[in-house]
Design a protein with these regions (language model features):
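Surface-exposed, Lys/Arg-rich phosphate-binding patches that contact polyanionic backbones
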Residues: 9-29, 63-82, 86
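Intrinsically disordered, low-complexity basic tails/linkers immediately adjacent to helix-turn-helix/homeobox/MYB/SANT
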Residues: 50-68, 107, 111, 116-118
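Short Lys/Arg-rich basic patches
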Residues: 1-11, 40-64
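Short, basic amphipathic alpha-helical segments that act as recognition/interaction helices
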Residues: 24-47, 78-101
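Core beta-strand-centered patch of the WYL/Sm-like small regulatory domain
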Residues: 93-201
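Generic structural detector for well-ordered beta-strands
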Residues: 5-7, 57-59, 131, 204, ...
Length: 282
């Protein structure tokens, strides 16, 4: 088994390690994928410079090991280390969603084939097999990653699934069903991972809550209206739980009622955890 050991800049190493964590993929697998992806493509050239950098090492898989020497020689690059740095440099010079397309090329390709053939596909997502009608793949701007928007037969509802967490895709002979074309088009135009379109949440902030709202930008829902201290957001319940839960007592959920109940139940569970801790300490 051939071991790759190459010194790269701190910046290059940081992006590789970040992608490994973000996409839950070992560094070695990333290295094998990008070698195969770039073996027949032009590479950007990079100079390491007069500094030590970081050492990246992993093993080539059997298939890549068999083709590596021929590919390296044909590249015309003087050393293997330089060749690997060029591959990595070319890879990291893509935006994250483009790097995702490289790492999960097979999944993207199969989904695209399913959509083009207008057939349902089966996907393995979080260990479960789901039959879905795939409508489109869209990048979530806030996350810089791609989602498959589809109708899921298992949930009998529209769903967004992270492409990077789809483990496998299978084709079927069943035709795609478009139950509500207008809704699908509207979701495409107003896309967000939580499918907030047409869903609303009303809240009331304390003075401190307003200050937090103005500062906390990550996952902040779209503001539709603000009147008499009441804020109305375009927001799905899932997004509301993610965003507003961090405000604790500085926000009051007014609508919808099911969100209020869910948040109350979660807070009760949290209180119970701390009460149990206090009982143990007595």
């Amino acid at each position: 088994m051939k071991k790759v050991r190459v010194t790269i800049s701190d910046f290059m190493n940081e992006i590789i390690k970040s992608d490994s964590e973000y996409f839950k993929m070992p560094v070695g697998r990333i290295g094998n994928i990008i070698f195969k992806y770039y073996m027949d493509k032009n590479l950007n050239k990079v100079e390491l410079g007069n500094f030590s950098g970081e050492v990246l090492q992993f093993n080539l898989n059997k298939n890549n090991e068999e083709i590596f020497m021929d590919t390296f020689v044909r590249s015309g690059v003087e050393t293997e280390a330089e060749y690997w740095r060029n591959i990595i440099f070319t890879y990291i010079n893509n935006l994250r969603y483009k790097r995702e397309e490289i790492l999960f090329e097979k999944i993207f390709r199969k989904i695209k084939e399913g959509m083009e053939s207008k057939r349902k596909i089966k996907i393995k997502y979080h260990k479960y097999i789901r039959l879905v009608s795939p409508y489109f793949v869209k990048v979530a701007d806030d996350e810089n990653r791609s989602y498959l928007f589809c109708y899921c037969e298992k949930n009998n509802d529209y769903r967004n699934y992270r492409i990077s967490e789809i483990e496998e895709v299978w084709f079927t002979n069943e035709n795609i069903e478009k139950k509500d074309k207008k809704y699908i088009d509207d979701v495409y135009k107003n896309f967000d991972p939580f499918l907030s379109y047409k869903n609303t949440v009303k809240v009331e902030f304390t003075e401190k809550g307003v200050e937090l709202y103005e500062k906390v930008l990550t996952n902040r829902p779209k503001l539709l209206d603000k009147k008499d201290g009441i804020y109305t957001f375009e927001c799905d319940n899932k997004l509301a739980m993610v965003y507003f839960a961090q405000f604790f007592s500085n926000v009051k959920i007014l609508e919808p009622s099911e969100l209020k109940e869910r948040l109350k139940n979660e807070l009760k569970k949290t209180i119970k955890i701390y009460e149990n801790e206090e009982e143990k300490d007595v």
